[in-house]
A protein has these predicted regions:
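Active-site neighborhoods and metal-handling regions in enzymes and metal-associated proteins
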Residues: 1-231
């Protein structure tokens, strides 16, 4: 949630404020960690040290106000570089085996959370109770945090893509939708599952099976190099 990364051909620096400096020094290994004091003066000092004439800013993470401040206060030409953002996205797209293993671990925690909820969800539970129980259980079994605010919705509320859990109680014959994920060592999982409490109607079965068929078709077709649009 904070920090400024500067990458020069010779060396990289991570400038971070006092709240996170201790953790950064323990976890950041690819660059020199610097305690933030007077940020723009510190950046200018590094620009001068490395003889940089231009600074490219990642437009994916830089706000307009930050960009204007850089342009006004840095002793170099500041470029809002869309190409830099593309390069960073490409680098992040391909994961190392270590990163993949951590994502898998995060997903396994979420899967165990879902399995736990199958016994917890019943008629009379509120959406908030379902959300809180799922959050608590994932944290209990190893999640360091939640990937995002857990969504737990029931009945007609399940049509809301990013609805907020309410005090609505689950009724028999309703769908319950859960969108959730766990974080493990900085890596996130994300999954959505829908269950029915009681006996589903024929229409509910049809809708569920239609979505399931589409999912299985996509899983069978997906391959390396395929675009999301083609899939």
């Amino acid at each position: 949630s904070a920090g400024t990364l500067l990458v020069f051909p010779e060396k990289a620096y991570f400038i971070i404020d006092f709240r996170y400096i201790e953790k950064a020094k323990k976890t950041v290994t690819a660059c020199e960690v610097i305690l933030q004091d007077k940020l723009y003066e510190q950046i200018n000092s590094l620009i001068e040290k490395h003889g940089a004439k231009t600074v490219s800013v990642n437009v994916d993470t830089c706000t307009l106000s930050e960009l204007i401040a850089y342009q006004q206060k840095l002793n170099a030409e500041v470029i809002a570089d869309t190409k830099l953002a593309e390069i960073i996205r490409e680098i992040r797209t391909v994961k190392s085996q270590e990163q993949i293993d951590k994502i898998i671990k995060a997903q396994r925690i979420a899967e165990k959370g879902f399995a736990h909820m199958l016994d917890f969800i019943r008629v009379g539970r509120t959406e908030k109770e379902i959300q809180l129980e799922l959050d608590y259980y994932m944290l209990k079994i190893g999640a360091e945090a939640l990937s995002f605010d857990t969504i737990a919705l029931s009945g007609s509320n399940t049509s809301l893509p990013h609805g907020v859990p309410s005090d609505k109680k689950v009724e028999s014959g309703e769908f319950v939708l859960m969108d959730f994920g766990a974080t493990y060592d900085g890596w996130h999982s994300d999954m959505t599952r829908t269950v029915c409490v009681g006996k589903p109607s024929d229409k509910m079965k049809s809708v569920y099976e239609t979505v399931l068929t589409a999912q299985l078709t996509a899983l069978d077709a997906v391959k390396a190099g395929m675009s999301g649009k083609a899939l």
